[in-house]
């Protein structure tokens, strides 16, 4: 199998892609003719082809060598430098979202709901503060369930982290993902500690229709909106700087409706996720097919409109992001953000193609597992 392929865009622009080094570059049509073994080609591009071949293009794909072991010292170093710890604060939620990953739509749903063990979580937090370097960055994340159902735990961890940080002087940040229906009870906690908030909101009242209250099945839209509006009104600077939104795409909303509602009301561009189609309960497949909407299709419909928001959200659309990522990471203009990227032919890969454990974050769940 060759390591270099030539491809042509719809506008008849020619590119080469070198798979061994994940490198893409724009080429002249004459060079494309040489690649296609056509005759009557400008001799300059014949020489250019020979030069590229001498530098490793148009050869056989190199075999991939995987690292088989991770040294203990690597893991210990990762833990000492871990930039984030995420606490699964609780399995409980005050909402009963139809598409929730903890619900019966999926086979990996949790049958037993419980809160995190606070003493074990505190022990982990103190250990991490003990091993981290003074002045380093450290984010503490709370998720669930709805983490504010177990708000006392959040308060406890914040208090302890601040106490520990009096000595350690870390660049400390708190983050929470919430459905916003309980934030009115914890505004002082969230604002005083400059939480980074990610609010889950699926758009307008119809779009929010799958996010119903556990106790009576009513739509959570107005409770969430009242709380979000209050947060924006009473703490406008905090809201502007520390609050973001995410939404789930389904058959009761659309990419256009989500963007237009959240941007027009809060001047925020939300992230949008389509429903996960893996591990679906066999008995719920029909429901999944009813609810599922392909984001690409919904984005395509949005792009066919004359919405004033199209230029505003352009950079968030899948097509732009994929193209941007491809050229950012696979072109002659690739900006190296990691020195290891320069050593692609010397660094062994992990078979799962992931980062090594705790290199980026650490999770602690309600079963006291890391």
Where are these regions (language model features)?
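Conserved radical SAM core fold
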Residues: 106-107, 147-149, 180-184, 196-218, ...
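Short amphipathic alpha-helices and their capping/turn segments at secondary-structure boundaries
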Residues: 125-129, 182-196, 259-265
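Conserved alpha-helical substructure of the radical SAM core
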Residues: 71-185
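Hydrophobic faces of well-ordered beta-strands that scaffold small-molecule active sites
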Residues: 85, 138-140, 174-176, 197-199, ...
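N-terminal [4Fe-4S]-dependent radical SAM core
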Residues: 2-17, 21-26, 45-86, 104, ...
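Short amphipathic alpha-helical recognition elements used for nucleic-acid or partner binding
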Residues: 26-39
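A broadly conserved sequence feature marking short terminus-proximal activation segments
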Residues: 46-68, 323-325, 353-354, 358-370
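Radical SAM enzyme [4Fe-4S]-AdoMet core and its adjacent flexible, acidic
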Residues: 211-225, 229, 233-357, 363-367
């Amino acid at each position: 199998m060759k390591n270099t392929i030539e491809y042509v865009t719809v506008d008849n622009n020619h590119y080469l892609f070198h798979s061994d080094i994940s490198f893409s570059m724009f080429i002249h049509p004459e060079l494309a003719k040489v690649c296609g073994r056509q005759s009557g080609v400008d001799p300059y591009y014949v020489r250019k082809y020979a030069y590229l071949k001498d530098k490793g293009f148009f050869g056989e794909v190199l075999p991939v060598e995987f690292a088989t072991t991770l040294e203990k010292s690597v893991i210990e170093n990762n833990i000492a430098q871990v930039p984030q710890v995420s606490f699964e604060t609780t399995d409980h939620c005050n909402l009963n979202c139809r598409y929730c990953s903890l619900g019966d739509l999926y086979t990996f749903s949790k049958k037993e709901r419980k809160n995190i063990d606070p003493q074990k979580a505190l022990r982990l937090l103190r250990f991490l503060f003990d091993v981290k370097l003074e002045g380093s960055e450290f984010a503490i994340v709370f998720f669930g369930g709805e983490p504010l159902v177990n708000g006392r735990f959040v308060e406890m961890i914040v208090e302890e982290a601040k106490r520990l940080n009096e000595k350690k002087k870390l660049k400390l940040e708190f983050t929470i993902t919430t459905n916003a229906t309980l934030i009115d009870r914890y505004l002082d906690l969230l604002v005083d500690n400059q939480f980074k908030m990610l609010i889950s909101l699926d758009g307008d009242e119809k779009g929010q229709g799958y996010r119903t209250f556990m106790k009576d099945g009513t739509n959570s839209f107005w409770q969430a909106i009242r709380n979000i509006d209050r947060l924006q009104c009473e703490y406008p600077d905090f809201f502007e700087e520390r609050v973001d939104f995410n939404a789930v795409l389904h058959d009761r909303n659309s990419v256009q409706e989500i963007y237009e509602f959240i941007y027009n009301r809060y001047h925020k561009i939300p992230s949008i996720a389509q429903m996960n189609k893996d591990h679906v309960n066999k008995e719920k497949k029909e429901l999944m097919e009813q609810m599922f909407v392909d984001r690409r299709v919904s984005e395509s419909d949005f792009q066919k409109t004359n919405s004033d928001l199209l230029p505003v959200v352009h950079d968030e659309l899948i097509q732009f992001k994929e193209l941007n990522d491809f050229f950012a990471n696979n072109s002659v203009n690739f900006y190296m953000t990691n020195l290891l990227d320069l050593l692609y032919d010397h660094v062994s890969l992990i078979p799962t193609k992931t980062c090594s454990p705790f290199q980026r974050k650490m999770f602690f769940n309600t079963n006291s597992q890391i």
